[in-house]
């Protein structure tokens, strides 16, 4: 398997990226708060025989350089665009956005729509979540998990460093200032580009806050006329860790639909029992 790790200069930042495989369209992974490329390597390796996969450390995380505080999703999307240019990645690409990475993936699509072939949103944050959820906290569990996963051995131990933890908290606080006006895309803006939205499971008890979270994700599914919304019944916020095959299948289905033009309603090959349709 062809794997290349490098650092590229994008504006004031040195950004670390690893590229797996060599088929097109490329799959580009945008991690969660504090997430590093390494947390997605297992997924990237599994896809490398079918697509070129770009996993990068969003500044200031992982092996990338420090970045200014409170950058906007559009600034982060422009950084990603610079990374793809520096790596010579052809467009359009399939974007995979996890948690806050979903906001950044949509910001990228808002700025560079013609460079997006499809999208997978993995328990994505939503620009209106603060207003809709108001004091209900299921989506904030993602932050707590980002801070505790290193202790479980699921993310690099360096995330226990104070500087990285402070960066996660700053990014989290910046996300709280997002409003509906910050949405880069309206329903239908992705046209018929394939889109799969994955939502974490409700847990042992279905709480009204989870239902609101699911409804926000149903709204995200309306960005494309060629979309699916699936609930990962057995997963927490880190679906790519708890149900990796569901995430892999979603990415493969979006790739297939982007390549062939066959709608997801006909192409979905998800194994029974791995998630429920919404």
Where is each model-derived feature located?
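Catalytic active-site module of serine/aspartate enzymes centered on a nucleophile-bearing elbow/loop
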Residues: 225-278
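Conserved serine/cysteine hydrolase catalytic core
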Residues: 159-232
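Active-site loop/oxyanion-hole signature of alpha/beta-hydrolase fold enzymes
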Residues: 55-96
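Conserved hydrolase catalytic core segment
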Residues: 91-133
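Flexible "cap/lid" loop of the alpha/beta hydrolase fold
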Residues: 120-152
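Conserved HGGG/HGGXW glycine-rich cap/lid loop of the alpha/beta-hydrolase fold
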Residues: 13-63
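N-terminal cap/lid segment of alpha/beta-hydrolase-fold proteins
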Residues: 1-14
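Short beta-to-alpha linker loops that shape the active-site pocket of alpha/beta-hydrolase fold enzymes
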Residues: 33, 57-60, 67, 125, ...
